[in-house]
Amino acid sequence: MKSLEYYRSQPKADVHTHLNLSMKYERYKQWSGVVIPNFPRKMRGLDEMHEIIGEYTRPQCKTAQDVLNLFTMSIEDAIADNVVVMETSVDIGFITHYEENLDHFLCDLSDLHRRYKRNVTLHFELGISKIRERSFVEQWAEPMMRSGIFENIDLYGPEISEGIEDFIYIFKLAEKYHLKKKAHVGEFSDAQSVRHFVEIFNLDEVQHGIGAATDENVLRFLAERKVRCNVCPTSNVMLNAVECLEKHPIKKMMDAGVRVGLGTDDLLFFGKTNSEQLFDMVSCGLITELHAEALLAVR
């Protein structure tokens, strides 16, 4: 079996990350001076994760410089894992840390592109939460999309279908500015919710999407539409979306012809790089080395 060092040595993509939470805990602890008890640890779903964010991480991020420091740590830890393509979500709300100075915000992102371009290709995606005030999104989404800094859009938040029609306008804007369209669904929700989100938003990619594995028809639908699911196995286990790594549906999805990419999601919380995830999945028999090579090849 190929070693962990082999997977670390291979160039790879990380196609599902959140840029403010994608550094290793040790680096974050050194920067913030904050020790999170019993961490990283398996959690009781997103509610417990958000409790930790509210108590330990959000209070440490107050200024534009704090945001930039977090982003920088995340990018450097990705590079250390030989990530050469990083698709990473930047929440629209960080404009408030920049005192609503859009030029300053965009300039910092542009500078990150330039600073690290020899090591990694960064694809910034505009992250928008479903619980964000609509007036705020309407104020900032279009100028951010129009800037050319963002290549993708990512809608996240509660995985419920009720009221999602309210977000169609965001994806129409994304189409206007030629952004790739993503949304979080199927992490805890079912196969039909995955199909519904893909259809109503005309998604190019799904963030997670593992709920689709319970329905062969939905897997076929995703495969036929060539919709990629950006799956985060360790995150799914740590948040109790999946009982254990051995029971993760990533292989079933790949074998059904669904395009699958691999992501760390929030490295700070889940503690496994993509190299480590590949090694762990092969080691436990979840996937074969051929599956691992296919995931390494994704860009």
From Swiss-Prot:
Q: Which residues bind substrate?
A: 18, 157, 266
Q: Where is the active site?
A: 187
Disulfide partners: none
Biological processes annotated in GO: nucleotide metabolic process
- Top EC group: hydrolase
Q: EC annotation? A: 3.5.4.-
Q: Where does Zn(2+) bind?
A: 16, 18, 184, 265
Question: Which UniProt keywords are given for this protein, alphabetically ordered?
Answer: Hydrolase, Metal-binding, Nucleotide metabolism, Zinc
Residues with site note (Important for catalytic activity): 208
Extract one GO molecular function annotation from the record: hydrolase activity, acting on carbon-nitrogen (but not peptide) bonds, in cyclic amidines
Q: Which residues cross the membrane?
A: none
Q: Which cofactor does it need?
A: Zn(2+)
Describe cofactor binding as the record notes it.
Binds 1 zinc ion per subunit.
- Cross-referenced NCBIfam families: PRK09358.3-6
The similarity annotation says: Belongs to the metallo-dependent hydrolases superfamily. Adenosine and AMP deaminases family.
> What is the purpose of this protein?
Putative nucleoside deaminase. May catalyze the hydrolytic deamination of adenosine or some similar substrate and play a role in purine metabolism.
Query: Know the name of this protein?
Result: Putative adenosine/adenine deaminase
